[in-house]
Amino acid sequence: MTFFEIHNASVWRGDTEALRDFSLDLRAGESTAVLGPNGAGKSTFLKLLTGEVRPEAQRGTPCRLFGEELWALEELRHRIGVVMPEEVARFEPGEIAADTVLSSLRGAYGRTRDMRFSQTDKSRALEAMELMGVAAIRHRPFGELSSGERRRFLVARALVHQPEVLVLDEPSTALDFSASLHLIVTLRQLLQQGRTLVWVTHHPGEIPPEIDRVVLLKNGCIFADGRKRDVLTEKVLTRLYEVDLKVRWSGGWCDVRFQ
């Protein structure tokens, strides 16, 4: 089943054509990495996926999410959980870490901001924090957490909605080795639950072994799309980054180095 589809669309950001003649289908139950250098169009793609921007020009079928036109129903976008690095700045240093997860439920499912959280809400928040390995530190102030701990709380904040699709924007940024390993374990659990993951990054070495499809972006266009080992080759990556690169594989990880 295809959960996101767009065909022959263009998106402008000011005077720049951020996405040009852009076509992409994403399938439910399939983990996908979207990879590209700075300025490739990754951020614009994310905004398109979450309904924050619309194509200025489009030929063919409209942009669809779960089979419906993306901007037709607001609730469609609630079926996607998005983790963005800049979300960290939204929270006060003194805010209790667990409250950052619970607060994600404000406004969801018709709630108003002054409604109290039910025991079900609290149980779901605790489950999400346990899944991310941060339940033991949930009573600490957010400002006292390490960068990696904050990132895991952000993922828990997205998971508390039990989304059908989880989008991770540069998820390995600021994560230490231990936190990165925990995130990989969590990805396996999410995949076993049938969740769909979209992993957006600028570095091929950050794509975990669980990802089976890679989409490369360059200058607002699809540069390559296919199975990971078919796409992440020395020839393709050298053309993508315009520098000679050496690729080695180890345990499903792609190790990329300068020639």
Predicted regions and their residues:
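Conserved catalytic motifs of ABC-family nucleotide-binding domains
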Residues: 162
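Catalytic Walker B motif of ABC-type/P-loop ATPase nucleotide-binding domains
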Residues: 166-170
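Conserved structural motif at the start of ABC-family nucleotide-binding domains
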Residues: 4, 18-21
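ABC ATPase nucleotide-binding domains
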Residues: 238-259
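Conserved ABC ATPase "signature" region
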Residues: 102, 117-137
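Conserved ABC ATPase signature
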Residues: 115-116, 141-145
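Helix-to-loop junction immediately C-terminal to a conserved catalytic motif
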Residues: 50
